[in-house]
């Protein structure tokens, strides 16, 4: 089972902390559910509907256990842009940190946006502005390959469809300060982030989930150059250690990507 595999490769002290035990409980309850079947899940005081338990379990691990999005704010009403809000886990976390946060949530995939809207409202969160569009380098629409849970992408292999888009650069330019900008847009970051370069000076904290798709330029240096020129310090992490990388070129259990990184950037 997924929970047992996770425990066997994780330090035993995971069981000593409340958050660790909660994580293990999530793995036990939901980690081995059949893939891509809509399910109801529960953690803490929250109840959600998700299109795929496996993807959701890893979201929980990154957001609530690893706390990739935790940040300090000088105001109780931080401005947060959540690009790639998916089913709403990140927003629940942000609202737990800062209940009065002013959040704009962008989700490109229409079916996932329905989950997002329903999950926020069913958990009493009604003050988030949800934009059912892709963030992009223009507002003319962008072609996405269809996905099932969290993998719809401009590089997707599924049926292509034109998704309405909004130019993120223009959205950010309207704000005096953005306390936290989250970008998890399945490969589109290599186009979107450079387009935003001249407005990133108003961003205080930046999270980018970087994706490199097989057959496409990796372009990590393109992303990091933008981040460095904007004056950020940054830390890079991956949620998948790879043995024998000269042999194992692909991202494990993924036939379309060969690299995924979490980039956390902040003002020194």
List where the protein language model places each region.
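Phosphate/nucleotide-binding beta-alpha loop and adjacent structural elements of enzyme active sites
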Residues: 1-268
